[in-house]
Curated annotation (Swiss-Prot):
PANTHER family: TRNA N6-ADENOSINE THREONYLCARBAMOYLTRANSFERASE (PTHR11735), TRNA N6-ADENOSINE THREONYLCARBAMOYLTRANSFERASE, MITOCHONDRIAL (PTHR11735:SF6). GO terms for molecular function: iron ion binding; N(6)-L-threonylcarbamoyladenine synthase activity. Its main location: cytoplasm. It is found in: Cytoplasm. Required for the formation of a threonylcarbamoyl group on adenosine at position 37 (t(6)A37) in tRNAs that read codons beginning with adenine. Is involved in the transfer of the threonylcarbamoyl moiety of threonylcarbamoyl-AMP (TC-AMP) to the N6 group of A37, together with TsaE and TsaB. TsaD likely plays a direct catalytic role in this reaction. One of its GO terms (biological process) is tRNA threonylcarbamoyladenosine modification. Its EC number is 2.3.1.234. Belongs to the KAE1 / TsaD family. It holds the Pfam family TsaD. Keywords: Acyltransferase, Cytoplasm, Iron, Metal-binding, Transferase, tRNA processing. The gene is tsaD. This is tRNA N6-adenosine threonylcarbamoyltransferase. Fe cation binds at residues 112, 116, 304. The keyword Oxidoreductase does not apply.
């Protein structure tokens, strides 16, 4: 069974073709709008939607030409339906529905977060058995789930304010750095010369629950930098290190608690922040020291992409899900 996946929830236009029977990604294409939005310091929804309109058909033509496949080979078209920018979601959903009607192909709505959660399966070496704990950590979400089977997601904890990735981006903005901020902060943190110069709080780290809070950490960065008389690049790097160290410390601590609480031994990490080198290193240490198995997405699939939507759509389709080609129902916000 072969599925075409379409991702358009924010500022990445992604198409991919996934073969469920072989559990193999056949092809994927991605167009990033980062350069377009960089001068605005963040994503402009109207521009994002227009770029999706301009690029979707071009990417579709390219992916079919490169694979030698045609729409006759496609069994299902999966598209991101929620959550995301409504205009951007509408573009992708309309494109999917139109193709479905023209070529008489079933369509299936995919939850963006489910796509991320399953993205480690895109690594051919990943053989993830249920149940497991999943940390979904991105610019819009920071959530811990217990996953007992496909489609059975029990929320264990989440951020009560800023998501971790959002805190990275806002910290970058506070320090006058570029967009996307998370990458800028992580890169500058690598240049720290005095890693103990700044000590920042670890919000909710010692709380018994599995919720997160990052707004206080962001405020601590603001106050620390405001009070710093020597706002040199060197000290900015030291502060980036302190921020990243605190944020990652909280994430790792909560993962450890979640594994203990649920008595699971498998941990799956996904979302844009899963590409962070320090997070991967610290979680690898946790797994090694306590005998856990840990799974990350391939680096290229940490951020939004069509491959994760094609794969999640394939899993949903074989489990009996599909929707009417005449209905379009997208949502800006929707829990998994």
């Amino acid at each position: 069974m072969i599925v075409l996946g379409i991702e358009s929830s924010c500022d990445e236009t992604g198409l991919a073709i996934y073969d469920y029977s072989k559990k193999k990604l056949i092809a994927d294409e991605l167009y990033s709008q980062v350069k377009l939005h960089k001068k605005y310091g963040g994503v402009v929804p109207e521009l994002a939607s227009r770029e999706h309109i301009a690029k979707l058909n071009l990417l579709a033509k390219k992916i079919f030409k490169e694979t030698g496949l045609s729409f006759e080979d496609i069994d299902c078209i999966a598209y991101t339906a929620m959550p995301g920018l409504v205009g951007a979601l509408m573009v992708g959903a309309t494109f999917a529905k139109t193709l479905g009607l023209i070529h008489n192909i079933d369509t299936i709505a995919v939850h963006h977060l489910e796509g991320h959660l399953l993205s480690p399966l895109l690594d051919h070496n990943s053989n993830i058995e249920y149940p497991f704990v999943a940390l979904l950590v991105s610019g819009g979400h920071t959530q811990l789930f217990e996953v007992k089977e496909f489609g059975e997601y029990s929320l264990l904890g989440e951020s009560i304010d800023d998501a971790a990735g959002e805190a990275f981006d806002k910290t970058a903005k506070l320090l006058g750095m570029g967009y996307p901020g998370g990458v800028e902060v992580a890169n500058l943190a690598d240049q720290a010369t005095d890693k103990s110069k700044y000590i920042l709080p670890r919000p909710m780290k010692n709380k018994p629950n599995l919720d997160f809070s990052f707004s206080g950490l962001k405020t601590a960065v603001l106050n620390t930098w405001y009070d710093e008389q020597d706002q040199s690049l060197e000290n900015k790097a030291n502060l980036c290190y302190a921020f990243q160290d605190a944020a990652i410390d909280v994430l790792v601590s909560k993962c450890a608690k979640a594994l203990q609480k649920t008595k699971n031994t498998r941990l799956v990490i996904s979302g844009g922040v899963s590409a962070n080198k320090l997070l991967r290193h610290q979680l690898d240490l946790l797994a090694k020291n306590r005998g856990y198995q840990i799974f990350f997405p391939p680096m290229k699939y940490c951020t939004d992409n069509g491959a994760m939507i094609a794969q999640a759509g394939a899993y949903r389709y074989v489990n009996g899900f599909k929707d009417s080609n005449l209905e379009i129902n997208v949502k800006a916000r929707s829990p998994l």
